[in-house]
Amino acid sequence: MTWETVIGLEIHVQLNTKSKIFSGASTAFGAEPNAHASVVECALPGVLPVMNREVVEKAIKLGLALDAKINRKNVFDRKNYFYPDLPKGYQISQLDLPIVEHGKLEIVVGGDVKTINVTRAHMEEDAGKSVHEGLNGATGIDLNRAGTPLLEVVSEPEMRSAAEAVAYAKALHSLVTWLDICDGNMAEGSFRIDANVSVRPKGQAEFGTRREIKNLNSFRFLDQAINYEAEAQIEILEDGGTVQQATMLFDPEKGETRVMRLKEDAHDYGYFPDPDLLPVIISDAQMQKAKAEMPELPKEMAARFVADYGVSEYDARLLTASRVQAAYFEEAAKESGQGKPTANWMNGELAATLNKEGMELADSPITAPRLAALVGKIADGTLSGKLAKKAFEAMWAEPETSIAEIIEKHSLQQMTDTGAVEAMVDEVLANNAKAVEQFKSGNEKALNAIVGQVMKTSKGKANPAQVQELIKAKLA
């Protein structure tokens, strides 16, 4: 039997406000336990929540970016459950009327574009956390994170592989950081993923029993957890068993999921309207302000890069993965006047070096103007491709040295003496009679071999295009 995996994601996006959703306490990460726990988070008697306007404004921007419906009237509900890190005994969330509904997000997997529908995004507060380390067997409660504003973004169960789920999560991560509503720091919990996974016989309309894998904080773990969970469910069903609805945890060391708790019913919580919070009405002025503050979105910018700079759609998607990357490319491409070569260098040599060194583009010793200067020297014939790679390495090691100084210092100037190049061509032709005969017989690959020999003789300083023209002229 052929099985189909069905995946839906619930992603908790921590909004990068300076204060919490219902109090003025700081949201700064890394403080001493409970340093940022106000009377609201501690649930002291008589305190009331006050809505943070910036949370609403950031939620509106996400709704606009997802081309979603934005509900102008917002009410809050109490999600009731007991846990030590939730002193109130309930979490303030949105149940029936989320601020964002019916959005969509495009993903690309294996070159194919697919649209994933976003069911909703609702505002809610985060809980605190339990601390077990260094307390001699006791458990401490840290409420610094409690009350931190979240947008829980819920997709439709439309992903059919771990690769699609990872692509969706990456696309949403890119979008919320692009909009500057979330810092995207997964290690600090700013972007946490819950994956709902089920399997069914391929072609069956009815969904299988789903299991929810909680708190995945890396794309690699998301991929591993989904693949393991899908295989585990298939094994249960093929052995004649029944998949029980459950909440799962992923063990990254073992690369496997395990049951945290069984769910007897899908509706675990008793919700009711929060009487302490008035409805939040989004005004026309707020909508207009949010629209005016919206940046050019990645999809729009990618289309413009294709039209204005002649880059491929694939390269444009890579270049618009972040605002930092897009701004870097546009600055370098404008300065050099060479869109496609700039994209090739960014997505090739520069990306590989940054990855090797474990660095971010913002910290690169090769700035956009320096890359533009390098690309310009290739365009005007000063550098060949091979010499340009050597120049790039020198530029990386010598961030204060100009491209002109590097070319002179390392003797990287491409040969301009036509007579000297012609003499090298004659020498190579004389020493490679077999390749010459193959080329004359119509073997184009032989030409590349001859050009390669000339480039080797010139130590990479000859112009490959000039060499090729000379060879063709001499063998015509």
Swiss-Prot record:
InterPro entries assigned: Asn/Gln-tRNA_amidoTrfase_suB/E, Asn/Gln-tRNA_Trfase_suB/E_cat, Asn/Gln_amidotransferase, Asn/Gln_tRNA_amidoTrase-B-like, GatB, GatB_C_1, GatB_Yqey_C_2, Gln-tRNA_amidoTrfase_suB_CS
Domain of life (superkingdom): Bacteria
SMART domains: GatB_Yqey
One Gene Ontology molecular-function label: glutaminyl-tRNA synthase (glutamine-hydrolyzing) activity
UniProt entry keywords in alphabetical sequence: ATP-binding, Ligase, Nucleotide-binding, Protein biosynthesis
Cysteine disulfide links: none
EC number, UniProt record: 6.3.5.-
Keyword Ligase on entry: yes
Catalytic activity: L-glutamyl-tRNA(Gln) + L-glutamine + ATP + H2O = L-glutaminyl-tRNA(Gln) + L-glutamate + ADP + phosphate + H(+); L-aspartyl-tRNA(Asn) + L-glutamine + ATP + H2O = L-asparaginyl-tRNA(Asn) + L-glutamate + ADP + phosphate + 2 H(+)
Matching SUPFAM superfamilies: GatB/YqeY motif, Glutamine synthetase/guanido kinase
Gene Ontology process terms (BP): glutaminyl-tRNAGln biosynthesis via transamidation; translation
UniProt function note: Allows the formation of correctly charged Asn-tRNA(Asn) or Gln-tRNA(Gln) through the transamidation of misacylated Asp-tRNA(Asn) or Glu-tRNA(Gln) in organisms which lack either or both of asparaginyl-tRNA or glutaminyl-tRNA synthetases. The reaction takes place in the presence of glutamine and ATP through an activated phospho-Asp-tRNA(Asn) or phospho-Glu-tRNA(Gln).
Subunit structure: Heterotrimer of A, B and C subunits.
Family per similarity comment: Belongs to the GatB/GatE family. GatB subfamily.
Protein name stated in the entry: Aspartyl/glutamyl-tRNA(Asn/Gln) amidotransferase subunit B
Organism: Neisseria gonorrhoeae (strain ATCC 700825 / FA 1090)
Lineage, broadest ranks: Bacteria, Pseudomonadati, Pseudomonadota, Betaproteobacteria, Neisseriales
